[in-house]
Design a protein with these regions (language model features):
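Hot-dog-fold acyl-thioester-processing enzymes
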Residues: 1-80
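HotDog/MaoC-like acyl-thioester-processing domains
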Residues: 1-3, 85-143
Length: 143
């Protein structure tokens, strides 16, 4: 059954998180990040989060968004992931975001048959509304 294109533009509720230095260091340790940018609080500008740190904000929320759109998360595979960094995340940043369905496409593969491709976009903004990161994530499901 085809994914209903009317879900394009559907948004999750808004979420707000505050970036913490301890969480940056925990994440950096977990992913093996050795850069002093993530560890040296005394360096000019202080520490910054590793590039993929924002994934912890969205943990579990993407599955909820798929479900809210009537999509079975167990049928979808991760297809593509793009992150645009407008500036680094720093301790104390208050970040607001929501997840939005950006696009729904249908593609026919020679061997795989018809597939639905759903793209979500998340824009992380700081307390004054400036973009910090833009994340586009694409999921693929065979019919």
């Amino acid at each position: 059954m085809a994914v209903d294109r009317s879900i394009i533009g559907r948004k999750s509720p808004s979420f707000t998180v505050t970036v913490e230095a301890g969480k940056i260091k925990e994440f950096a340790a977990a992913v093996g990040e050795a850069s002093e940018l993530c560890w040296d609080e005394d360096r000019p500008g202080g520490i910054v989060a590793p590039p993929t740190f924002s994934h912890i904000f969205r943990s579990g929320k993407m599955e909820l968004m798929l479900s809210d759109c009537g999509l079975d998360a167990t049928k979808f595979l991760h297809g593509e992931h793009e992150m645009v960094y407008h500036r680094p995340l720093r301790p104390g940043d208050r970040i607001s975001y929501h997840i939005e369905v950006a696009d729904v496409q249908e593609k026919a593969g020679r061997r795989s048959g018809t597939m639905d491709i759903v793209t979500f976009e998340t824009v992380l903004r700081d307390a004054v509304g400036e973009k910090v990161q833009t994340i586009r994530q694409t999921f693929v499901a065979r019919r």
